[in-house]
C-alpha cells in the first residue's frame, strides 16, 4: 500500500515515517529540506517543496491510498493562523480532486471539540498554557479542523497532549472522544496509533483525544 506523509522531517513525522517503512508501506513525502530525513531519504520517494503549492501537493499524493499530515504551526513562530487554514483548504481540494478519501491529521488535546467533552484539570491547564504562550497555534488548529469537518474526506483528527520520548507506565494508547486520561503520550506509541488509522475505520470523521495508556 502506498501512502503520502506531509511533514515527515519533524519530531513526530520522522518516527511515523520510520515505523511506516518498517511495516512495509511504500511512501512518498513532501519536504522542504530532504536532508532532514537523514538516512531515511534513500528509502522513500520525496517531493521537494511546500504544502502551500498545489502542484507539489498533487505530485506528492498522486496514486496513494491514504495521506498522513503532521504539518502545523510551530509553537514559537505561528504569526498567521489563516496560513494554516489556507494550507488545509489546499490539501482538501487536492485530495478530493484525486479521489483520495483517507486523511489523518494531527491536532492537539487543547483544542475545542464537541459539546459533551469533559474538561479535566490537566486539559484545562494545557489550554490555558497555550493561550498564554502560543494563542495563534490554538486558533490555527481550530481553523484547520473547521475546514476538515466541511470536507468529503474520510478524515481522522488525532488530538494528543504533550508528546514525549519518555516511556510511561501502562501500555499503548487510550483514545476517547470525550476524555483525556493523561496529559502526556509517548511519541512511539502515538506514531503506532496514527499508522493504525490508515486502515482502521474506528475513528473516521472523528477527533479522538489520545494519551498514554
Stretches with model-predicted labels:
Residues 3-23:
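N-terminal Rossmann NAD(P)H-binding glycine-rich loop of SDR-like oxidoreductase domains
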Residues 4, 35-90, 94-97, 198-199:
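NAD(P)H-binding glycine-rich loop region in Rossmannoid oxidoreductase-like domains
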Residues 31, 107, 159-162:
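Conserved SDR Rossmann-fold cofactor-binding beta-strand/turn motif
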Residues 34, 90-136, 144:
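Conserved Rossmann-fold NAD(P)-dependent oxidoreductase catalytic core, especially the SDR/UDP-sugar
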Residues 84-85, 139-140, 158, 182-195, ...:
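Substrate-positioning beta->alpha
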Residues 145-166:
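Conserved beta-loop-beta element that borders a ligand/cofactor-binding pocket
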Residues 155, 200-213:
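Core catalytic loop region at the nicotinamide-binding pocket of NAD(P)H-dependent oxidoreductases
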Residues 167-172, 197-206:
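Glycine/proline-rich active-site loop of Rossmann-fold NAD(P)-dependent oxidoreductases
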Amino acid at each position: 500500500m502506498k501512502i503520502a506523509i506531509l511533514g515527515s522531517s519533524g519530531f513526530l513525522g520522522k518516527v511515523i515515517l520510520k515505523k511506516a517503512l518498517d511495516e512495509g508501506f511504500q511512501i512518498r513525502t513532501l519536504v522542504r529540506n530532504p536532508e532532514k530525513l537523514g538516512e531515511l531519504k534513500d528509502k522513500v520517494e520525496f517531493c521537494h517543496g511546500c504544502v502551500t503549492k498545489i502542484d507539489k501537493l498533487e505530485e506528492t499524493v498522486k496514486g496513494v491510498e491514504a495521506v498522513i499530515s503532521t504539518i502545523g504551526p510551530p509553537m514559537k513562530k505561528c504569526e498567521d493562523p489563516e496560513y494554516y487554514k489556507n494550507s488545509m483548504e489546499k490539501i482538501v481540494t487536492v485530495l478530493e480532486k484525486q479521489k483520495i478519501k483517507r486523511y489523518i491529521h494531527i491536532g492537539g488535546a487543547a483544542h475545542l471539540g464537541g459539546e459533551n467533552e469533559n474538561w479535566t484539570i490537566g486539559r484545562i491547564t494545557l489550554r490555558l498554557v497555550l493561550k498564554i504562550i502560543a494563542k495563534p497555534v490554538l486558533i490555527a488548529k481550530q481553523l484547520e479542523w473547521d475546514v476538515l469537518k466541511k470536507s468529503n474526506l474520510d478524515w481522522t483528527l488525532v488530538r494528543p497532549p504533550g508528546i514525549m520520548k519518555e516511556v510511561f507506565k501502562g501500555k499503548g494508547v487510550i483514545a476517547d472522544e470525550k476524555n483525556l486520561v493523561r496529559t502526556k503520550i509517548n511519541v512511539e506509541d502515538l506514531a503506532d496509533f496514527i499508522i493504525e488509522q490508515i486502515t482502521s475505520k474506528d475513528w473516521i470523521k472523528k477527533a479522538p483525544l489520545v494519551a498514554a495508556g
